[in-house]
């Protein structure tokens, strides 16, 4: 059994080694194919350039022969149209050559353009814009479109680098910016390190940097603690006072709410009685002055200037009618009127005919009050305010 296990493990190791070797061979082969593809592409571009140059040369050679009929045999120079055509071809050939050189340069410096913060891509785009001003044929426009596709890919990669490396700090670039800021960028041509320079240069560098940093520090606001520099201690919770202690204290002072409430009710009763007596005196005065003429109930209780005062008058008059000092009845127009009563009649009714009394409820809204004032033309209240 042990021999079989050893043979199995040995077979597995050989299989893994064989798989690794095959994978490595595949990677090497793929890399070689990529190199071959790049070489073939460059060769194709060179062949296209050579073919274009040969075609242009053939056209230039055929040009004078074809125009020999138009020119005189004594004319030693080329026709102006043919000369202009040759100049245009040379210009287009130069533009194509510059486009191919620009594309090749950008492809070679692809990693530097993407991984660094240089303006190489911007400069290449500006150069392409200058070349595009002279483009007049589709072949040059196709090269311009090819360059734009390449530039857009590089811009997309730079954008990804920007999003992923936002927190990355490039100390080399920071040092270069500091040297440019203090005016020591010329030191790169004279010496490689700052330690090799004179002490005066280093001192001036730090003095200028200190001056700029101090100016920024003066603009920053100072930080203040709300509780000061000491550590705030948590205040102890006060014990809750019991309710019975507060009640005992109130009894000792004699300020009892119940007594105050009783005094208030008694005072209100006295006020109501005084107001009822005052209105009764006004009603009796009217009856003495006009003994045979009853007074209109609405004209007596309505106050044309105050709805609330009218309600109070109705309330007080109800006590007068309840106690029998006046009575209310309806006249011929079915309107309520007030009539006086005799004292003897009041005593008799209290003794024997108290069961004949009737009670009624009067409903008066704000609109009803306004209608009564306008209908009865009440301009002045019969019950004057006592205050």
From Swiss-Prot:
Function: Tissue-specific component of the SMC5-SMC6 complex, a complex involved in repair of DNA double-strand breaks by homologous recombination. The complex may promote sister chromatid homologous recombination by recruiting the SMC1-SMC3 cohesin complex to double-strand breaks. The complex is required for telomere maintenance via recombination and mediates sumoylation of shelterin complex (telosome) components.
Record text on subunit structure and interactions: Component of the SMC5-SMC6 complex which consists at least of SMC5, SMC6, NSMCE2, NSMCE1, NSMCE4A or EID3 and NSMCE3. NSMCE1, NSMCE4A or EID3 and NSMCE3 probably form a subcomplex that bridges the head domains of the SMC5:SMC6 heterodimer. Homodimer, and heterodimer with EID2. Interacts with the C-terminal region of CREBBP.
PANTHER family named among the record's database cross-references: EP300-INTERACTING INHIBITOR OF DIFFERENTIATION 3 (PTHR16140:SF1), NON-STRUCTURAL MAINTENANCE OF CHROMOSOMES ELEMENT 4 (PTHR16140)
Gene: Eid3
Protein name: EP300-interacting inhibitor of differentiation 3
Any one Gene Ontology BP term: DNA repair
Protein family membership: Belongs to the NSE4 family.
GO cellular component: chromosome, telomeric region; cytoplasm; nucleus; Smc5-Smc6 complex
Keyword terms of this UniProt record: Chromosome, Cytoplasm, DNA damage, DNA recombination, DNA repair, Nucleus, Repressor, Telomere, Transcription, Transcription regulation
InterPro entries assigned: Nse4/EID, Nse4_C, Nse4_Nse3-bd
Stretch list, region Disordered: 1-77
Bridged cysteine pairs (disulfide): none
Record flagged with keyword Transport: no
Compositionally biased region (Basic and acidic residues): 1-19
One Pfam assignment: Nse4_C
Keyword Protein biosynthesis assigned: no
UniProt-annotated location(s): Nucleus; Cytoplasm; Chromosome, Telomere
Compositionally biased region (Acidic residues): 32-72
